[in-house]
Amino acid sequence: MAKHQVNYTANGGLPIVLTTVDRLVQWGRSNSLWALSYGLACCAIEMMASGASRYDFDRFGTIFRASPRHSEVMIIAGTLTKKHAEFTRRLYDQMPEPKWVISMGSCANTGGMFNTYSTVQGVDRIIPVDIYLPGCAPRPETLQYALMILQKKIRRQSAFRAQGVKRLEA
């Protein structure tokens, strides 16, 4: 038994859990992240490798989806061109709240080596980004670590106040 563990039991010796609704909702959200895989260049290959059995993102509750309406996390992997910028914004707007964005790779973060008239110099100029993954191309382990950081970030947020739900006064 752990040092500070307290075992509460109710009428008949059944264990009970003491927590808040906010923590319960955030635990559920953080452990069932459905990601929109939005691969634009080389980083998409590493993102696809992360969905294979070797890295097994399913054990963290991360499932890749093709529809933005079924996703909470958008992973943008690769170079974003100005031609794709409006489409990227539209996909982001179609995602339900709450939503998070991971910018994967140097090209998505800052435009990378493609400093041209047709390249967006960072995804954060189009949509808000929560986590930046550096590298060319980041390994699947790095993406896995970023998802674990995102899970911690989600658990720290309030489930209801972030969406504008106000407390009712009696």
UniProtKB/Swiss-Prot annotation:
Binds 1 [4Fe-4S] cluster. Its EC number is 7.1.1.-. It holds the Pfam family Oxidored_q6. Its cofactor is [4Fe-4S] cluster. It comes from the Bacteria. It is a peripheral membrane protein. It catalyses: a quinone + NADH + 5 H(+)(in) = a quinol + NAD(+) + 4 H(+)(out). GO terms for biological process: aerobic respiration; electron transport coupled proton transport. It is an enzyme of class 7 (translocase). The keyword Membrane applies. Keywords: 4Fe-4S, Cell inner membrane, Cell membrane, Iron, Iron-sulfur, Membrane, Metal-binding, NAD, Quinone, Translocase, Transport, Ubiquinone. It is found in: Cell inner membrane. One of its GO terms (cellular component) is plasma membrane. The keyword ATP-binding does not apply. NDH-1 shuttles electrons from NADH, via FMN and iron-sulfur (Fe-S) centers, to quinones in the respiratory chain. The immediate electron acceptor for the enzyme in this species is believed to be ubiquinone. Couples the redox reaction to proton translocation (for every two electrons transferred, four hydrogen ions are translocated across the cytoplasmic membrane), and thus conserves the redox energy in a proton gradient. This is NADH-quinone oxidoreductase subunit B. It comes from Campylobacter curvus (strain 525.92).
